């Protein structure tokens, strides 16, 4: 089966910092060569201090967000503590693996801060997961994003530095990937809070890159 018509373009990135993590995406949604939306949401909050980025089929991604959010809340109610990032990733991995013969066309980043510190995991449509110790990118614009991330990431970055790096990586990807574009959505997660940056602040930071 030719899956090309089911695949949707996107660029999302994740950056691991000393005091938290940064998740970011652009906001263009496409159907083939048609721009279906310029305000698509691709970074979701799935627990108090855990977020997820989605690339691929919008419907599949939204179903997975609902699933993992509910399971995370049920776990918290039963055990009076939050699931770890690895635990949430394992839950998602098992669900994707069970559906391998009817795969959900998604590529995900799950990241946040738990009792073990900041962390990010990447998952593919078959449920394969990799712990990312520094940087990660998904979607059709990821090759361009990785060029920036690999070149400018350094050890011991703070989230303030990491968010500028994430914005730069997405910004550069939108220049060459026609399926990525429009505004940039940025989330910063520290041990204190899950914070989605104001769009005007992101625009101001992005303007400095031109």
From Swiss-Prot:
One of its GO terms (cellular component) is cytoplasm. Its main location: cytoplasm. Keywords: Autocatalytic cleavage, Cytoplasm, Hydrolase, Protease, Proteasome, Threonine protease, Zymogen. PROSITE patterns: PROTEASOME_BETA_1, PROTEASOME_BETA_2. Gene3D superfamilies: Glutamine Phosphoribosylpyrophosphate, subunit 1, domain 1. The 20S proteasome core is composed of 14 alpha and 14 beta subunits that assemble into four stacked heptameric rings, resulting in a barrel-shaped structure. The two inner rings, each composed of seven catalytic beta subunits, are sandwiched by two outer rings, each composed of seven alpha subunits. The catalytic chamber with the active sites is on the inside of the barrel. Has a gated structure, the ends of the cylinder being occluded by the N-termini of the alpha-subunits. Is capped at one or both ends by the proteasome regulatory ATPase, PAN. PANTHER family: ATP-DEPENDENT PROTEASE SUBUNIT HSLV, METALLOPROTEASE TLDD. Component of the proteasome core, a large protease complex with broad specificity involved in protein degradation. This is Proteasome subunit beta. It comes from Methanosarcina thermophila. The gene is psmB.
